[in-house]
């Protein structure tokens, strides 16, 4: 019986020691915990604002779609796009503008118009050397809005 108690205490102390030793070791963070938000990988609000500024310039120069933006309050439009991208990518912004459906009602936006606008956005992303992975993630976030934008 005495031998059993010694053995029991030996095992108990060993388990505690191993447990403490394993707690003291640095555990490797998981890949998910390490991965920064898309907002951060895009460079934050300043970088998003720069891309949106270029995107709006691209749209203004694009004869396929620029007429659709006649009479639009461009500074307000830019702010809405920045906030939408910022919030959608995990940033601290809050999108407070009209819904996509309400914003595009009556504009008669076609699939060709939508495609042209996406091309203008991709051109802006490319100009700022946004990596393909981040571009794909952003377009995947914005893509579902197509149903509320395209009306014909």
Residue ranges and their predicted role:
Residues 24-152:
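Core of compact, soluble alpha-helical bundle domains
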Residues 14-15:
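Repetitive helical segments and hydrophobic/amphipathic motifs
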Residues 18-22:
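C-terminal motif of bacterial Sec signal peptides marking the signal peptidase cleavage site
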Residues 1-11:
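Bacterial N-terminal signal peptides that target proteins for export
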């Amino acid at each position: 019986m005495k031998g059993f108690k010694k053995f029991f205490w030996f095992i108990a102390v060993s388990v505690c020691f191993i447990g403490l030793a394993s707690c003291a070791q640095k555990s490797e963070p998981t890949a998910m915990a390490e991965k920064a938000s898309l907002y951060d990988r895009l460079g934050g609000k300043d970088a998003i604002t720069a891309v949106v500024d270029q995107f709006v310039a691209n749209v203004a120069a694009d004869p396929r779609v620029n007429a659709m933006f006649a009479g639009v309050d461009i500074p307000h439009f830019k702010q809405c796009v920045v906030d939408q991208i910022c919030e959608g990518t995990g940033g601290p912004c809050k999108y407070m503008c009209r819904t996509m459906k309400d914003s595009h009602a009556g504009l008669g936006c076609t699939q060709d118009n939508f495609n042209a606008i996406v091309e203008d956005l991709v051109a802006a992303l490319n100009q700022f050397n946004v990596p393909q992975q981040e571009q794909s993630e952003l377009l995947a976030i914005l893509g579902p809005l197509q149903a509320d934008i395209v009306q014909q």
